[in-house]
Amino acid sequence: VAYSGLVDGDTFNGTYTGAFSDKNVGTGKTVTITPSYTGADVSNYSITNHADVTANITVRSLNVSGVTASDKTYDGSVTATMNSSSAVYSGFVSGDDFAASYSGVFADANVGTGKTVTITSSYAGADVSNYNITDQTSTTADISAKALTATASASNKVYDGSSAATVTLSLSGFVGSETVTSTNSSTFSDKNVGTGKT
């Protein structure tokens, strides 16, 4: 800092603080200077303070990690339930108005472990534009098999010398209109006449 008009040898010191007009990203932003002067000879001067200056505030990098997807039972869809309770926002300035939401889809609807879930991120809040955000793009989760319930009924028959049985098998618990084809080979416990035979 140059002091025009300062007499050589005088005891005079100046310190300065500055404040931007606001905290947000921008170029050529006004910085208001607040001076403080000390020294034995300060009272000998009528001081014209430094004019305000300009400077830039650039975007801050923000890296997102730790978003997870919940395992699920097969339901015929690729939709994943996301969990951001353990998300980490590296570079976030505490107190900023910033909110994040996430949706996810499995690579396919089929049963499997460690399946890739693609993450779609959405951010809101007054301070979002102050960040250059590197999204978390994927995670993994499992799809487990859905249980089906089988019911069976055997047909009565007239003694024919064999233990062969005719059984009708019914399955319930399918997703939507899905079905499977099933076959069975069934026999009575023996070939003889009886009631309530296994």
Regions found by a protein language model. Give the residues of each.
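Short loop/turn motifs that initiate or flank beta-strands
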Residues: 1-198
